[in-house]
């Protein structure tokens, strides 16, 4: 959801030529799967466009060099990421909610089924992140 929420925020400000935004998983369990149907419904409910052909891929060590930021939704993903990208000398790796000044993980709808709370967390953090990047 975060990829498409952030893309929508960037697009709404006419900044899409200045950003390349892509999501990737730290684990292999969802590789090749499309966006989870309840996440699609939540994005649709908020009018957020998404790529219907998007499938999950795993982050790679090369992604560290390709991207300016690598943002994890929660501390567990951050721990798993360290197996793939053990060092962060350029301070690129951050927790999503830290951009909103909140010291907690994004609410995980996998366990709660509450995609609306997750949407709100991600949207709040993405708004703050975009503000920081364009300031």
Question: Would you name each region that the model predicts?
Answer:
Residues 1-66, 131-135:
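Conserved active-site segments centered on acidic
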Residues 1-2, 49-51, 72-76, 86:
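A short linear-motif detector with a strong N-terminal bias
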Residues 63, 69, 75-135:
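Phosphate-binding/catalytic loops
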